[in-house]
Amino acid sequence: DAENAYFLLCHLGWDKRWGTDAYSGDYPCLDDAAMDYIIAGDYKGIGFDVIGLDPIADENLTRHKKLFQNKDIVNIENLKDLDKCGKGLFSFSCFPLKLENCDGSPIRAVAWFED
């Protein structure tokens, strides 16, 4: 179903560590093949239950730069409860705050499912 989605949301199970020191430690990141798949796709956005696309030690933000130089795409980080969404298609939207002179914002993420 991923090829039919507008947003690709990745449940890695990392949100279970929210509120612990482990959450912002050595979290999982996409490898080059996954990044190439996303860049080649026609997605409007991607989302994850981790703190970022890049490893915490990558101060150059290599994956962020690769993604945004090749795509006009939304990147959503720190999602929670993606395990409740299942593996099929569903409707998803996110609502950011309107902030000036910022490159990011907290959001309200909402998923809903057809009967």
Q: PLM ranges: what are they?
A:
Residues 1-115:
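Active-/binding-site microenvironments in catalytic and ligand-binding cores
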